[in-house]
UniProtKB/Swiss-Prot annotation:
UniProt cross-references to PANTHER family, sorted A to Z: 30S/40S RIBOSOMAL PROTEIN S3 (PTHR11760), SMALL RIBOSOMAL SUBUNIT PROTEIN US3C (PTHR11760:SF19)
Keyword set, alphabetical order: Ribonucleoprotein, Ribosomal protein, RNA-binding, rRNA-binding
GO terms, biological process: translation
GO CC terms, sorted: cytosolic small ribosomal subunit
InterPro entries, per the entry: KH_dom, KH_dom-like_a/b, KH_dom_type_2, KH_sf_prok-type, Ribosomal_S3_C_sf, Ribosomal_uS3_bac-typ, Ribosomal_uS3_C, Ribosomal_uS3_CS
Family according to the record: Belongs to the universal ribosomal protein uS3 family.
Known partners and oligomeric status: Part of the 30S ribosomal subunit. Forms a tight complex with proteins S10 and S14.
Biological source species: Prochlorococcus marinus (strain MIT 9515)
Gene name of this polypeptide: rpsC
Residue intervals of the KH type-2 domain: 39-110
This protein's name: Small ribosomal subunit protein uS3
GO function terms (MF aspect): mRNA binding; rRNA binding; structural constituent of ribosome
Length: 244
């Protein structure tokens, strides 16, 4: 079953958290669910070059809280936070409610090459530039190994290198335990639009195991942070508190 099911959905509540945190009645649930879809779609299209890994949504009364995990926070924040105001107005327009309070927090991804979605996005960009898929996979593996991941699996399917018959090929380095529920496995799915058709890209990243009564992952054998390295940036939106 571990090889068939989505690794993120299998580990919800164990090592993975829900991407949307809110409760609603049976009448308002589909409306809020559609809002979440529109918000994520709008952000991914508007900031396709910002390297957004994930968008977490939380709702408290009439307030909407967003947490954007990105590799380039400066693209979203802008000069003196001007990009946040533009993003807030765009979200309000997308959901059709100009009076909705929207709070946005931008968090920089600490290890870009250890993030499954950013790795999949990198592979998709290289394939769209018509780089050979085997070379692209090898480069992605090297980047992930330098980031200190414990295991990585990459699968690419479609008309590889313009072949007439579609096929899928995969490669794995290290250990990727899909059946172990306490294993923190980051999973991502992306598509690359090439001249020969659409290629599907799947990436599994094994970061470590979460032991009982331990909240943080213990990555055995992972590469430690170098001394003097830059800490990840975080921009917290405080405009809603000041206005209220």
């Amino acid at each position: 079953m571990g090889n068939k099911i989505n690794p993120t959905g299998l580990r919800l509540g164990i090592t993975q958290e829900h991407r949307s945190k809110w409760f609603a009645t049976s009448k308002t649930y589909p409306i809020l669910l559609q809002e979440d879809y529109k918000i994520r779609n709008f952000i991914q299209k508007k900031y396709s070059s910002a390297g957004i890994s994930d968008v977490l949504i939380a709702r408290k009364a009439d307030q909407l809280e967003l947490e954007l995990k990105t590799a380039r926070p400066g693209v979203i924040v802008g000069r003196q936070g001007s990009g946040i105001e533009e993003l807030r107005s765009g979200i309000q327009k997308t959901i059709g409610d100009r009076t909705r309070q929207v709070r946005i927090n931008v968090v920089e991804v600490e290890r870009v090459d250890a993030d499954a979605y950013l790795l999949a996005e990198y592979i998709a960009q290289q394939l769209e530039k018509r780089v050979a898929f085997r070379r692209t996979i090898r480069m992605a593996l090297q980047r992930a190994q330098r980031a200190g991941v414990l295991g990585l699996k990459i699968q690419v399917g479609g008309r590889l290198n313009g072949a007439e018959i579609a096929r899928s090929e995969w490669t794995r380095e290290g250990r990727v335990p899909l059946h172990t529920l306490r294993a923190e496995v980051d999973y991502a799915l992306r598509e690359a639009n090439t001249t020969y058709g659409v290629l599907g890209i799947k990436v599994w990243v094994f970061k470590g195991e979460v032991l009982p009564k331990e909240e943080q992952t213990i990555p055995v054998g992972a590469i430690p942070r170098r001394k003097g390295s830059r800490k990840p940036q975080q921009f917290e939106d405080r405009s809603s508190n000041e206005n209220s």
